[in-house]
């Protein structure tokens, strides 16, 4: 074939490629290794780089690309004769091209380090290689450790990255598998102890400790003891159980029978199951030494019994019934007073129906009406506070709040409202000095004690709020 001249070759336009900077294949493949494939711009850039690296070289000579003697084939290695011919026609001193199968960048002094790993190519494994070998992870082109070929070591030295230098074949040792290393038998040489402990006093020491722990344990169930109770070291649970059993004089019966023993098979008297069988627990309390006579049966001494309040007699009850009947007939709680005139008329009829009250009021009509005007405000306040009568025609907010203060149940019945109204009338008319006043107060106390059991001292509080305090 006719050799081709690089000057006569037609090169494609590459507007975006930097002249003189051939690309580096990421997978270590040769790229434009034949000088005949280089462009004139690349050769000119290389000449300028060589001039910067080696100052003082001649620059007036022109560089001519060498003629290719062989056919242009990709990925072909140029012979040394072509390198010598190219360098012979140039006055500058340029280093010869390396014979390695790699591309060299003219912009750097040395070949740049590649950051990518070589392309992993699957090869049939000859032997099982340890997965813990670092070189097997970094490069798959590494030969088997058993192969002692120096050519393979030289080839692998150019592929390895960040690893230790390859060792020679003479220093290599066969590397075993993880199974072989973990299952290698180990020879352990027994050694005699350097000291001889003395256990002569061990039993004495343990017996002393056991006696010490027994001092703080309940003799019935084995729980933590709180002291001597009824003559025996026991806990609070067994002490209370024994005291209650003696106080109530209870006769327990075991379900296992009379021949039951304190064991796990029958009835165990320990901390966990001491409450399962009360008969065996009480029997063990007596067996360990608890004394019945040490239990004080009557803990409380005889105290003077407070005299109870005397129940009201028949005469007082009749007076209260008379007052209650007059109240229900003239102004019961279910009746709503609509006006002041209606209220004055109802109060006047109520007072006239009770002889004990009418005898204390004046006989004159004008004086009677004036007395009724004085007691009307208090009676209306009592109805508004303890009944469902709203009393819309009279403003008595302050007296109502005074009566209701501190009372839980503010709804009273007819008897209670009648007694409160009668007591209020007596306090306004003669200051509560009449004999009937005491009967009304006792009747109110007795009635409140039956309907307001949780209201302690309710009668005394109400008596203090009646009378002149409601008219202020």
From Swiss-Prot:
<feature type="region of interest" description="Disordered">
    <location>
        <begin position="57"/>
        <end position="112"/>
    </location>
</feature>
<dbReference type="GO" id="GO:0005634">
    <property type="term" value="C:nucleus"/>
</dbReference>
<feature type="region of interest" description="Disordered">
    <location>
        <begin position="138"/>
        <end position="184"/>
    </location>
</feature>
<keyword id="KW-0675">Receptor</keyword>
<dbReference type="GO" id="GO:0000978">
    <property type="term" value="F:RNA polymerase II cis-regulatory region sequence-specific DNA binding"/>
</dbReference>
<dbReference type="GO" id="GO:0030522">
    <property type="term" value="P:intracellular receptor signaling pathway"/>
</dbReference>
<dbReference type="InterPro" id="IPR013088">
    <property type="entry name" value="Znf_NHR/GATA"/>
</dbReference>
<feature type="compositionally biased region" description="Polar residues">
    <location>
        <begin position="159"/>
        <end position="171"/>
    </location>
</feature>
<keyword id="KW-0862">Zinc</keyword>
<keyword id="KW-0238">DNA-binding</keyword>
<dbReference type="GO" id="GO:0009755">
    <property type="term" value="P:hormone-mediated signaling pathway"/>
</dbReference>
<dbReference type="GO" id="GO:0030154">
    <property type="term" value="P:cell differentiation"/>
</dbReference>
<feature type="zinc finger region" description="NR C4-type">
    <location>
        <begin position="218"/>
        <end position="238"/>
    </location>
</feature>
<dbReference type="InterPro" id="IPR050234">
    <property type="entry name" value="Nuclear_hormone_rcpt_NR1"/>
</dbReference>
<feature type="zinc finger region" description="NR C4-type">
    <location>
        <begin position="267"/>
        <end position="285"/>
    </location>
</feature>
<protein>
    <recommendedName>
        <fullName>Nuclear hormone receptor family member nhr-2</fullName>
    </recommendedName>
</protein>
<keyword id="KW-0804">Transcription</keyword>
<dbReference type="Pfam" id="PF00105">
    <property type="entry name" value="zf-C4"/>
</dbReference>
<feature type="compositionally biased region" description="Polar residues">
    <location>
        <begin position="57"/>
        <end position="83"/>
    </location>
</feature>
<dbReference type="InterPro" id="IPR001628">
    <property type="entry name" value="Znf_hrmn_rcpt"/>
</dbReference>
<dbReference type="GO" id="GO:0008270">
    <property type="term" value="F:zinc ion binding"/>
</dbReference>
<feature type="compositionally biased region" description="Polar residues">
    <location>
        <begin position="138"/>
        <end position="147"/>
    </location>
</feature>
<keyword id="KW-0863">Zinc-finger</keyword>
<dbReference type="GO" id="GO:0004879">
    <property type="term" value="F:nuclear receptor activity"/>
</dbReference>
<keyword id="KW-0479">Metal-binding</keyword>
<dbReference type="GO" id="GO:0045944">
    <property type="term" value="P:positive regulation of transcription by RNA polymerase II"/>
</dbReference>
<comment type="function">
    <text>Orphan nuclear receptor.</text>
</comment>
<feature type="DNA-binding region" description="Nuclear receptor">
    <location>
        <begin position="215"/>
        <end position="297"/>
    </location>
</feature>
<keyword id="KW-0539">Nucleus</keyword>
<dbReference type="GO" id="GO:0000122">
    <property type="term" value="P:negative regulation of transcription by RNA polymerase II"/>
</dbReference>
<keyword id="KW-0805">Transcription regulation</keyword>
<feature type="compositionally biased region" description="Polar residues">
    <location>
        <begin position="90"/>
        <end position="112"/>
    </location>
</feature>
<comment type="similarity">
    <text>Belongs to the nuclear hormone receptor family.</text>
</comment>
